[in-house]
């Protein structure tokens, strides 16, 4: 006589993973998470940061998650990544943001959103502003933050944007060094492929002049503001707060805007700002 005994365990009735709490804030190659916030002169803008409960089963209980600012982690990142303090990420000033100290994740749900309100009036993007957040742990809390270091922390690089900021293709840009006698050798052009425009206000951005490197120690001296007049002839006017660079716009410049829907994702709109400007400094 033979007996066959079979044991069956419904593996999906038991939790396969710990139900840890984490931010959904993927870290980029620069050690932080870039977030883009619409610049509003005199107003506030809200960014919604996802928070999730890990696990293979639905969240089984109501959880109240505590959020804290974590400048220690930012200090560690700066020390490990940069050899110069002028390149450090800077903790965003406390008067420029607000968020609730706790967030509720109801039973039966896997995620929620942390609403962060920003006030970015007159912010100087010469500095690399970061809002460092952490999920606070305590034995009295009814949750655990994720033990992996990048999951329970969010280093949010705050990047305001307007209709003219972003990365520009500059493959056609030509930068020359003027000789002492005022002549220019056009065979010695300095090549550049892209330049980044940073927000100043709703209709103004700044670039670093010419081919100046964005990691230059005294790069702040070479900020050139480009003001895009939204009406009329759509002119571009350039200025600098530093008279010592002797900025001179050589000709009047206008700009055009083209908006093209994405071919495969119709909810996306590609916006192309085009202009040509001649200046010397």
Predicted features by range, described:
Residues 8-104, 113, 117-131, 136-281:
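Intrinsically disordered, low-complexity regulatory regions in eukaryotic proteins
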Residues 1-9:
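Sec-dependent bacterial lipoprotein signal peptides
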Residues 3, 105-107:
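Multi-pass membrane catalytic core of lipid/isoprenoid biosynthesis enzymes
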């Amino acid at each position: 006589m033979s007996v066959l005994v079979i044991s069956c365990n419904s593996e999906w009735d038991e939790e396969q993973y710990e139900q840890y709490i984490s931010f959904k804030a993927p870290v980029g190659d620069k050690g932080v998470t870039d977030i883009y916030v619409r610049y509003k002169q005199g107003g506030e803008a809200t960014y919604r940061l996802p928070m999730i409960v890990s696990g293979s089963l639905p969240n089984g209980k109501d959880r109240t998650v505590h959020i804290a600012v974590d400048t220690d982690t930012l200090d560690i990142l700066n020390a490990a990544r940069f050899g110069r303090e002028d390149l450090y990420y800077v903790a965003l000033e406390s008067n420029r943001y607000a968020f609730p100290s706790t967030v509720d994740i109801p039973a039966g749900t896997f995620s929620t959103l942390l609403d962060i309100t920003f006030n970015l009036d007159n912010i100087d993007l010469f500095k690399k502003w970061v809002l460092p957040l952490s999920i606070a742990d305590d034995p009295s809390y009814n949750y655990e933050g994720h033990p992996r270091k990048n999951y329970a922390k969010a280093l949010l690089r705050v990047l305001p944007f307007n209709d003219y900021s972003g990365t520009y293709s500059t493959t056609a840009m030509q930068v020359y060094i003027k000789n002492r006698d005022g002549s220019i050798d056009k065979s010695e052009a300095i090549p550049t492929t892209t330049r980044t425009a940073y927000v100043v206000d709703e209709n103004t951005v700044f670039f670093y002049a010419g081919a100046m490197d964005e990691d230059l120690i005294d790069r702040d001296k070479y900020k050139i503001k480009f003001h895009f007049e939204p009406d009329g002839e759509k002119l571009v006017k350039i200025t600098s707060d530093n008279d010592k660079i002797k900025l001179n716009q050589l000709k009047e410049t206008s700009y055009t805007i083209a908006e093209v829907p994405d071919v495969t994702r119709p909810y996306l709109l590609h916006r192309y700002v085009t202009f040509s400007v001649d200046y010397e400094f």
